[in-house]
Amino acid sequence: MYKRQKLANTYDVPVTVRSGGTSLAGGAIPVCGGIVLLMERLNKIIELNAEGMYMEVEAGVRTVDIQKYANEAGFLYAGDPCSAESCLIGGNIATNAGGNKAVRYGVTRDQVYAVEVVTPTGEIVELGARLKKKSTGYCLEQLIMGSEGTLGIITKATLKLQPIPPYRFDLLAVFSDPEQALDVVPKIMQAGINPTSVEYMDNSYVRGTADYLEFKGAPHYENGIYVIITVETFSEDELDLKMEQLDELCSAAGAVDVLEADERIWDMRRNCQESVRLISLVSLTDDVVVPVNEIAGTIKFIMKIGEKYPFPVKINAHIGDGNLHIVLCKCELSDEEWENKVEAFHKEVYTYAYSIGGRLAGEHGIGAKKLREMETYTPAGELAIMRTIKAAMDPQLILNPGKIFDL
């Protein structure tokens, strides 16, 4: 691989790395032509070290296979994107993927000790180390994470493992009022419950996913808004205490029902994106992130402005960490009206989110999709430093060109 990259650099040939192809931002599309580098054959789990609590894997291993391998050895790999069945770990690192467990364990960069990278000029470098802390200059492994294949080709990764909490409960709090559903979240976070997941589905998603999965007994199908909460602990007494707290908090906030969330409820959450095809073959998914204390206001804002647009607006969210997924459905709109209205809608949402300290993407990345918006909704000084780094590491500008920003 490094020899191919040296040749590409010598002859100024663009190279785009394609991992699992699950990007929702066009990150793996070769917009400038050239070579597309497929990673699926780099699929070996090299080592699991139980004493050191780490795994070393190649970049083409499916995330779900890493999770299963760790679980079989009695450990947890905490990275858990909803596309785990099909995405690859290299792509997770390149986009700094999040997922359902990020509220407790953090995003992908929090699960990685080190990476092996082929640089744009064709050198093989190892960045990072299996250390809980270090103070030895720039943290270059973190620079690669979230760079979307523009600064280097990730070939291997050393991943952190966690002990598996033996006690777990999944709770479903159902609300009829979206404001009540949203306002309960800061109370949960302030109570010290430290949930593993806090997920939100508006009623259009409750009905849509239940229909898609043919789940006829979905609780409060007609008007329910779901807040799904997972709590994991290392003692049964602690779990009982936290579940009692959650029940009281949700009931006091106005929940019409508080029950156990079985696997069918999680299937609904995981199939939000797929369920959209029941009403529209064309849809667009967005991925803004805002400060956690602003998420209720942001969803209320989106619901309000959505009323004036001619397409359905559906919202699911990792509300525990401020990350919203807004899905717009084309349905029967003409191409021209769809494109014009979508652009206007996104401008309103991005402007609002940026004004309260938010950013364009929480876990999907910028890719080619939001390249233009990156100029408007990112601080100028931040962009300038990014461009300087890109030019220094990739002087020929051949690695995944046309992504994140223009040079």
Regions found by a protein language model. Give the residues of each.
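Glycine-rich N-terminal segment of FAD-binding domains in flavoprotein oxidoreductases
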Residues: K3-L42, H318, A353
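A glycine- and small-aliphatic-rich helix-loop capping segment at beta-alpha/alpha-beta transitions
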Residues: N9, G27-N43, N71-F75, G99-R109, ...
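FAD-binding subdomain of flavoenzyme oxidoreductases
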Residues: K44-E199, L399
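Activity-critical C-terminal alpha-helical subdomain
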Residues: E123, L371-L407
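C-terminal substrate-recognition/cap domain of FAD-linked oxidoreductases
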Residues: P163, V174, L182-E348, Y352, ...
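Alpha-helix capping/hinge segments and adjacent helical runs
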Residues: Y354-I366, A391, P395-L399
